Amino acid sequence: MQIFVKTLTGKTITLEVEPSDTIENVKAKIQDKEGIPPDQQRLIFAGKQLEDGRTLSDYNIQKESTLHLVLRLRGGMQIFVKTLTGKTITLEVEPSDTIENVKAKIQDKEGIPPDQQRLIFAGKQLEDGRTLSDYNIQKESTLHLVLRLRGGMQIFVKTLTGKTITLEVEPSDTIENVKAKIQDKEGIPPDQQRLIFAGKQLEDGRTLSDYNIQKESTLHLVLRLRGGMQIFVKTLTGKTITLEVEPSDTIENVKAKIQDKEGIPPDQQRLIFAGKQLEDGRTLSDYNIQKESTLHLVLRLRGGMQIFVKTLTGKTITLEVEPSDTIENVKAKIQDKEGIPPDQQRLIFAGKQLEDGRTLSDYNIQKESTLHLVLRLRGGMQIFVKTLTGKTITLEVEPSDTIENVKAKIQDKEGIPPDQQRLIFAGKQLEDGRTLSDYNIQKESTLHLVLRLRGGMQIFVKTLTGKTITLEVEPSDTIENVKAKIQDKEGIPPDQQRLIFAGKQLEDGRTLSDYNIQKESTLHLVLRLRGGMQIFVKTLTGKTITLEVEPSDTIENVKAKIQDKQGIPPDQQRLIFAGKQLEDGRTLSDYNIQKESTLHLVLRLRGGMQIFVKTLTGKTITLEVEPSNTIKKSKQEDGRTFLTTLSRKSTPCACSWA
């Protein structure tokens, strides 16, 4: 079959080939026709560079298809592609590569289809048919990759003159790109544009979606109309650079001006003013930098990085640092940001306290690592940790130490990994992020160490409303801990919770395993609605039992209390109040049983039954009885006493009312 090969000069070569020809074969045919060595040829089809060992049919190249021939005129080069997630991709390219070809390389590396890619350089979107050299993209240049996540949308840009410009954009467009579109429409250079949305100046490197700018949103365009000012930048070598700037210039923009003058890439620059490192997205006016102010330029010798410092309040501080920074330096940066004196700071990483004279690289602290900041509130103290084997460990701690830090100290002493440790104090499991002082743990307090020997399990907690809560627990969890989990899920304070299992109320200091509570067991949750009260239970033998109960106790729970006191199994108990048999699932308050009320306990000896008693007035009374009931036994119904004096003799019965 015939195929065509088009060169960058516009010349078209016709080749006779077969679908089974390799790309290497095709290059040999081009060499025969044009004299171009195969190692200087790169063939492109459908935006992809063709590999020598593959065949035409592998790429679905059919008769009269057109390949594009790109010559390796100058050696290759590396460029970088930065995504919105911050990931940087390195690509091997040539100046003659088309943008389409670059997108194909990105697809090969990242799997992103070319039609979902938009490449930005110097604030401009790159067109598929153009080459890298067309855009003056040189070695080690950085392109920005924006994904076409959703279809385009319209936004409006309103100028101070009242004119409104309509732009076609995508949520993933950068502000820099929007300014380029405004330049295309209005001829205003991007560096003279400031875009405002919701009262904020928009930063070039951010996207419309970062600012939640949606379709038909209106941005405000402010021009940099007033004249600039001079500032000075002093380097560590003592050299002073003079820059023409405006108060609205971003730090990023100032760094670009320094690059223009001195050739120092922005990512190697750190600018300091009034002891603070300046952040790229902020403006000179944000830092109150005025005319003839002097900034200090510090170079990132081995490439800076960002780390995070998390305080005990949960606040996270972002710091710009270098691997060679000492811990002392880092504390100084924290002081600049938060005002905390270095001697009150303790920095923790991977469970270890960091020493002032050491560097971040000494501790293998890398970009985006998180340090924990603990304040030295008071001097140190000793606490004890008791294991289940009876061994007692002595630890030197401070009230401001986190539980995580205590676990790290235990690991140092005993070799037990922190994730296998559970620390208990006053019946509560201690949470990693909290401090000893949060739990009022003082000098010479004793913590209990429980090992996570087996994985967790699920249990269920059923409320009186019928709702079932699922909890992830461990057999060694205390009841207090389970109540804390219920509070997390349902918001019920632990002191209002009573947990029942197998008819018993569970005590806070005991564990689930103490009660033989296993996976998928169901506990019953009873709320302490009002304070407790005393009631009486009268048996048929005349004995009276006193019980401590709450109005929210279920009848089932009352029976459990009777079992605890008298040893009578709940299924043999029948409780009567105001002539009614009480149902297990109902509460005392359901029956209006109040303090010092008396219930009657009837035993189910051989299974109960119902009988009917018909009065002379025609009324029928239903009674719950047992075959063992005597005829002379008195029963209460509707507040009256029904006395039967039926004789077991063969004579007709005589009935009387009292």
From Swiss-Prot:
Designated name of the protein: Polyubiquitin
UniProt KW Repeat keyword: yes
Any one annotated GO CC term: nucleus
UniProt function note: Ubiquitin Exists either covalently attached to another protein, or free (unanchored). When covalently bound, it is conjugated to target proteins via an isopeptide bond either as a monomer (monoubiquitin), a polymer linked via different Lys residues of the ubiquitin (polyubiquitin chains) or a linear polymer linked via the initiator Met of the ubiquitin (linear polyubiquitin chains).
Phosphoserine: modified positions: 65
Glycyl lysine isopeptide (Gly-Lys) (interchain with K-? in acceptor proteins) crosslink residues: 76
Location of the protein in the cell: Cytoplasm; Nucleus
Note from the entry: For the sake of clarity sequence features are annotated only for the first chain, and are not repeated for each of the following chains.
Protein source organism: Cricetulus griseus (Chinese hamster)
The keyword Protein biosynthesis appears for this protein: no
Family matches, as PROSITE patterns: UBIQUITIN_1, UBIQUITIN_2
Keywords from the UniProt entry: Cytoplasm, Isopeptide bond, Nucleus, Phosphoprotein, Repeat, Ubl conjugation
InterPro entries (alphabetical): Ubiquitin-like_dom (IPR000626), Ubiquitin-like_domsf (IPR029071), Ubiquitin_CS (IPR019954), Ubiquitin_dom (IPR019956), Ubiquitin_ubiquitin-like (IPR050158)
Residues carrying the site annotation Interacts with activating enzyme: 54, 72
Predominant location category: cytoplasm
Positions bearing the site annotation: Essential for function: 68
UniProt family annotation: Belongs to the ubiquitin family.
Cross-link (Glycyl lysine isopeptide (Lys-Gly) (interchain with G-Cter in ubiquitin)): 6, 11, 27, 29, 33, 48, 63
Domain Ubiquitin-like per the UniProt entry, residue ranges: 1-76, 77-152, 153-228, 229-304, 305-380, 381-456, 457-532, 533-608
SUPFAM superfamilies, sorted: Ubiquitin-like (SSF54236)
Gene3D superfamilies in UniProt: Phosphatidylinositol 3-kinase Catalytic Subunit, Chain A, domain 1
Pfam families, alphabetized: ubiquitin (PF00240)
